[in-house]
């Protein structure tokens, strides 16, 4: 399988409402089409994740100008900003209980192309069962999780990133102040 095939199979799986295991610019993640309520529910279930712990969405870089720097950064926006100003089409079970939503622009050609072809944000959360350590590489992903997702993107060499830690997380408060949640 080549990169073009991997992208097409991933987009097809997402359009069919499937959950996926895929590489990002930080660590391997599991995700789904952010517009698909049922797929988001299945993602919470397969990770055994409490709904109080929201998941972030990856968005296409051409539409967003958020942060720049050496380390990928997830921004958590309050509902009044992401809902009214960002025009995101996402499932209603994706934002946190307080209405906030984590958003990141991935610096990863595979993710960018999948998001572009899908035409929608991609849910992203670490490829681990809730409460367990995040895997630093594909070989550390638990077999149980690989069995639970509907589609696994193959670990092609051109898809692997040298970055092996989660993104920095900054929460934007309604008044515009910023709080660093994960440096």
Feature locations, PLM:
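Active-site-adjacent structural elements in enzyme catalytic cores
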Residues: 1-183
